[in-house]
Regions:
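Catalytic alpha-helical scaffold of carbohydrate-active enzymes acting on polysaccharides/glycoconjugates
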Residues: 1-147, 153-186
Length: 186
C-alpha cells in the first residue's frame, strides 16, 4: 500500500524588513514567490515544473491579506497560475498585512508593533480577517476556499469557531515541529 501524502505550500509575499526599518525597506511581492535569477524561477516556477514532472498536485495556501498593501493583481496572477497548473488553492492569512490599512503605519511602529498572530484575538476579529481573505479570493475570481492555514500556524479555539462561522470546514494550522499547540486546547 502506498503512503498517501498531501503536499502543501505557503505562498506569500514578504514584509522584507519594512517593520524593522521602514525608511529603507519595502515589502516584496512576486519576486519573493518566483525567486527569479537570470530570467529563471528558482521558486514557484521550479516547484510547478518539479510537481508536473512527477504528476503530483499540491495544495497551495495563498496569503490574501497582502492585497491591503499590493492591491489584488500581484497575488491574483499567482493564484490563477496555480489553478491553471492543476493545483488546489486555499486560504492563508498573515494579519500583519492589516497594519498597512493605516496610512501612518510607520509612525505607529514604536508604540504598537504589528501582531501577526490570528490566535489571541476575539472571534469577531478573526471572522473579519477570514472575511477579508474570502473577499480577496472572490475579487481574484478563484474558487472559494474550504481550508485555512493561519500565519505561523498560530491557532486557538477561537480560530476554529470563526472558521466554522465563515464556512471553512478544514484547518491546516497545526504543525507540531514548528508551532505545537497548547496541549489542553487543541
Amino acid at each position: 500500500m502506498k503512503t498517501q501524502v498531501c503536499i502543501t505550500v505557503d505562498t506569500e509575499f514578504d514584509i522584507a524588513g519594512a517593520f524593522a526599518d521602514p525608511a529603507r525597506c519595502r515589502p516584496v511581492a512576486q519576486q519573493s514567490v518566483l525567486c527569479e535569477i537570470d530570467g529563471r524561477s528558482h521558486g514557484l516556477g521550479f516547484m510547478l515544473e518539479t510537481l508536473a514532472a512527477h504528476g503530483i498536485a499540491a495544495t497551495f495556501f495563498v496569503e490574501a491579506l497582502n492585497s491591503l498593501y499590493f492591491g489584488d493583481e500581484p497575488m491574483r496572477v499567482i493564484a490563477h497560475r496555480l489553478l491553471q497548473a492543476g493545483h488546489d488553492v486555499q486560504l492563508h492569512l498573515h494579519p500583519c498585512w492589516t497594519y498597512f490599512r493605516d496610512p501612518a503605519w510607520r509612525d505607529r511602529l514604536a508604540s504598537m508593533p504589528p501582531n501577526d498572530s490570528v490566535a489571541g484575538r476575539s472571534e469577531e476579529e478573526v471572522q473579519a480577517l477570514i472575511a477579508a481573505g474570502l473577499a480577496a479570493f472572490a475579487r481574484w475570481e478563484v474558487p472559494r476556499p474550504v481550508a485555512l492555514r493561519t500565519g505561523g500556524l498560530h491557532v486557538d479555539l477561537t480560530v476554529y469557531a470563526a472558521m466554522h462561522r465563515q464556512g471553512l470546514p478544514v484547518a491546516s494550522n497545526v504543525g507540531f515541529a514548528r508551532k505545537p499547540p497548547p496541549p489542553s486546547s487543541i
